[in-house]
Amino acid sequence: MSTNSIKLLASDVHRGLAELVSKRLGLRLTPSELKRESTGEVQFSIGESVRDEDIFIICQIGSGEVNDRVFELMIMINACKTASARRITVILPNFPYARQDRKDKSRAPITAKLMADMLTTAGCDHVITMDLHASQIQGFFDVPVDNLYAEPSVVRYIKETIDYSEAIIISSDAGGAKRAAGLADRLDLNFELIHKERARANEVSRMVLVVDVTDKICVIVDDMADTCGTLAKAAEVLLDNNAKDVIAIVTHGILSGNAIKNINNSKLKKVVCTNTVPFEDKLKLCLKLDTIDISAVIAESIRRLHNGESISYLFKNAPCK
């Protein structure tokens, strides 16, 4: 059992997930203040001593504000480091720039590696994330990384809300096949893949379905929903092939650009996202949106890490609500 206490910190901008986690742990959020000067520079201060404490910084980053939130996070980490915190763990459920994990064209940067370098340079000792877009990002770090999975929480949601005896798990591309197949195995369901051809980024020109989905509840699973164009087209293809209903379940609801319009105008019955990304404002604009709360997973990972217990239990099991 660790003798130093847990201190939870969160940005002033998105505190929803941090507040849920703090309630589950029976802890208050450590007082802090983040101010933006007229010059655009950020000042951050911690309202009490964090010397020799176990710090957990919970950072939710919304769509369209990535760069500001990332730099604010670096300042928060460095403030804890210079205040002599014993250990600083950053909880980034949706890791920024995760899709830029390799050189996919000449002279392109590997920005996910830059993110890892920035976090460690700022003073981060440990990172907790969820459903990394590319698992090899863990290898970019010189500090420990725990990549949690939303799958156990998704399994619970499906069992509680869907007549899954009539369901089939769908992956909208080859990249998500492993994730969808794993979920299908957990539920003892069939898994199928939709082949998609892209004309350009975020734009799907053609989708091909090679299985019979007649009278099936099709559950499309993916790690993130951005503009939701792919999900909308997938739903159309599935329903044109006599599917009963189409539900999308994604870990990271980025919901950028015309996402809400695309969902509202689509044939999707429901789009379910975890709260790794803040999208409370969008819930009011789209009745098809639903949320899976992963605060229990984050809270339990904090408790286990602080007490020196294994986190691998959470890879296959969802904590009690």
UniProtKB/Swiss-Prot annotation:
SUPFAM superfamilies: PRTase-like. Mg(2+) binds at D131, H133, D142, D146. Its EC number is 2.7.6.1. GO terms for biological process: 5-phosphoribose 1-diphosphate biosynthetic process; purine nucleotide biosynthetic process; regulation of cell size; ribonucleoside monophosphate biosynthetic process. GO terms for molecular function: ATP binding; kinase activity; magnesium ion binding; ribose phosphate diphosphokinase activity. Gene3D superfamilies: 3.40.50.2020. Keywords: ATP-binding, Kinase, Magnesium, Metal-binding, Nucleotide biosynthesis, Nucleotide-binding, Transferase. The keyword ATP-binding applies. It catalyses: D-ribose 5-phosphate + ATP = 5-phospho-alpha-D-ribose 1-diphosphate + AMP + H(+). Signal peptide: none annotated. GO terms for cellular component: cytoplasm; ribose phosphate diphosphokinase complex. The keyword ATP-binding applies. PROSITE patterns: PRPP_SYNTHASE. InterPro entries: PRib_PP_synth_CS, Pribosyltran_N, PRibTrfase_dom, PRTase-like, Rib-P_diPkinase. Belongs to the ribose-phosphate pyrophosphokinase family. This is Ribose-phosphate pyrophosphokinase 1. It comes from Candida albicans.
